[in-house]
């Protein structure tokens, strides 16, 4: 792949070995001199002007997350008949013409029918969707307090992130990221807030992304 082009406002940090997203987030926050820190998984899309919309409402003791869609990242297009198959494992053959040649077509759009604003975790720190919460009166405004998040994306003042100790690298590189983030938000006296004024879309690599135990 070609190298990333230089930009005076972008600092690329290289590691010989993968260090995991907890450590990577900590390194980025430590190197930054910005007022805010925003963490986003690579397999995500964001709303235009998402940062400005979050800054307008962010309070010093808040951790904020955009409302979330599922991401329609790509389709598989049959090179023979042009039929397209929804993202996932590359089809072995086209169901329309039995052709075996396919090319990836980038879509990169949110799926409107897959929308979430609230999450929680159980007594085992296991992440859960909180579907019923979105119907409560307190969840009808543009800013909604939620118990947890999936951990793919968050926004807060950088000094608060550092004061909370960043992400706990002793807890592993990946698992329970959202549970740790949310627990630190409200156990420190702050809040975890979903903003409906903006959104992010996350690619969930489940379902037809898996075949014969591989994804």
Where is each model-derived feature located?
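A recurrent flexible, glycine/aromatic-enriched loop bordering the glycosyltransferase active site
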Residues: 22, 132-155
